[in-house]
C-alpha cells in the first residue's frame, strides 16, 4: 500500500509500505477518505512527541471494513464489508467517566493516529482492538468526503451541548473554521435569538458565510481589540449570553470574557499549542460578571450517533464546509491549504 509518512517538521513522504497486519482482535480499513484535523496540522508544522518520525498521521478516516480478526469485538451493527467511520478517542471503557457515558474524558484515553497507533493517511489503516467499539456505520449514500466530518462535527456538537444555549440567547462564535461553521448551524437549530460569527481572517470568514451564512445574523473581522466593539454595538452594550471560542488564540480567550454578558456562559473549545498553553486572563471579568467559563473536548459515543443523523438531514449545508480535496500524493498541499487559510475543511482521498 501507499502511505504518507511525516519524516520531520513540515516534511512528508508518500511511499510504498507493507499493509498493516491484522490483529486477531482488530480489523483493517480500506480508506476512502481522511480529513486533515487542526491537530494533524499543528503536529505537521510543529512536531509532537506522540508522532515519532517517520509517522503516519490521520485520525478522521472513513472507509470499508476490509478484514476482521476472528476475535474482534465489533458493535452489533458493524460487520466486514461495512462502510464505517472511526471515532478518534480510544477509551478504556471501564473508568468512572466511560461508565457515565463521558468517554471523551476517559482517564486512560489515547488518540488514534498517534503513538502507538499509526493513522489513516494511507490506502489501508489498522483498526486496533481498543478502537473496534468506535466503528460506526455510515448511511449507504453518504459521500466519503462528507463522512470524514463525522468526528470533528461530533466534537463541535459536544461544545454546543456544553454551551447550553437557551431560547433567544445571543450566541457569538469566535473562529470561522469548520468547527465555528458547524456550531453556528447548531446554535440556530437550538433556538438562538442571534448568531454572530467573527474571525481574524476576512477570507476565511467569507468562505464560512458562503457555506453556512443562512444560520448567521451578522459577521465581522476581528480587529486589534478582538472584535469587542463590534459585538457591544450589536447588543446595546450588553454582550452575548453564550460564547464559543473555536480558535486556538489567547487573544480570543480574553476577548470572550470582555464580550460576555453578565452570567454568560463561555466555552473554550479550541486548545492552545502545547508549547504555549497559558493565557493571561482578566479574572475580574469572570468575578464581577459571574461568568461560567468551561472547556469542551472531544466527543462521546452518543454524540457520534447524533452526528450520523445530522449528516443525513443537513447534507448540503454541512458538505459546503468541505472546500478542498487532495489525493494522497498531494497531502503536503493539503497541509499548506490549512496553514494559509485558503480553505475550511480539507480532505485526503487515497
Set out the residue ranges of the language-model regions.
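Glycine-rich phosphate-binding loop and adjacent beta-alpha segment
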Residues: 250-313, 350
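Glycine-rich beta-strand-centered segment in the early N-terminal region that forms part
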Residues: 20-34, 48-96, 139-141
Amino acid at each position: 500500500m501507499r502511505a504518507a509518512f511525516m519524516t520531520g517538521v513540515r516534511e512528508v513522504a508518500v511511499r510504498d509500505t507493507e499493509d498493516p497486519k491484522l490483529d486477531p482482535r482488530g480489523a483493517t480499513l480500506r480508506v476512502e477518505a481522511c480529513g486533515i484535523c487542526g491537530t494533524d496540522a499543528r503536529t505537521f508544522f510543529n512536531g509532537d512527541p506522540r508522532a515519532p518520525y517517520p509517522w503516519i498521521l490521520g485520525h478522521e478516516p472513513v472507509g470499508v471494513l476490509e478484514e476482521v480478526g476472528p476475535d474482534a469485538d465489533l458493535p452489533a451493527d458493524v460487520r466486514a464489508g461495512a462502510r464505517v467511520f472511526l471515532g478518534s478517542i480510544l477509551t478504556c471503557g471501564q473508568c468512572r467517566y466511560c461508565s457515565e457515558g463521558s468517554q471523551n474524558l476517559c482517564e486512560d484515553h489515547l488518540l488514534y493516529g498517534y503513538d502507538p497507533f499509526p493513522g489513516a493517511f494511507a490506502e489501508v489503516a489498522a483498526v486496533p482492538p481498543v478502537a473496534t467499539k468506535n466503528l460506526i456505520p455510515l448511511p449507504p449514500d453518504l459521500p466519503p468526503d462528507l463522512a470524514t466530518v463525522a468526528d470533528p462535527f461530533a466534537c463541535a456538537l459536544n461544545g454546543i451541548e456544553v454551551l447550553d444555549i437557551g431560547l433567544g440567547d445571543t450566541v457569538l462564535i469566535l473562529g470561522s473554521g469548520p468547527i465555528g461553521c458547524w456550531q453556528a448551524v447548531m446554535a440556530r437549530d437550538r433556538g438562538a435569538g442571534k448568531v454572530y460569527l467573527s474571525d481574524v481572517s476576512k477570507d476565511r470568514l467569507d468562505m464560512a458565510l458562503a457555506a453556512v451564512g443562512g444560520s448567521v445574523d451578522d459577521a465581522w473581522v476581528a480587529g486589534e481589540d478582538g472584535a469587542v466593539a463590534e459585538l457591544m454595538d450589536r447588543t446595546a452594550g450588553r454582550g452575548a449570553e453564550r460564547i464559543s471560542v473555536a480558535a486556538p488564540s489567547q487573544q480570543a480567550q480574553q476577548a470572550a470574557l470582555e464580550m460576555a454578558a453578565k452570567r454568560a456562559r463561555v466555552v473554550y473549545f479550541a486548545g492552545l499549542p502545547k508549547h504555549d498553553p497559558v493565557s493571561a486572563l482578566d479574572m475580574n471579568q469572570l468575578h464581577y460578571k459571574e461568568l461560567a467559563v468551561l472547556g469542551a473536548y472531544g466527543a462521546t459515543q452518543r454524540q457520534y450517533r447524533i452526528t450520523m443523523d445530522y449528516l443525513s438531514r443537513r447534507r448540503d449545508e454541512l458538505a459546503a464546509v468541505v472546500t478542498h480535496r487532495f489525493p494522497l500524493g498531494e497531502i503536503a498541499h493539503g497541509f499548506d491549504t490549512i496553514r494559509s487559510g485558503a480553505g475550511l475543511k480539507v480532505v485526503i482521498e487515497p
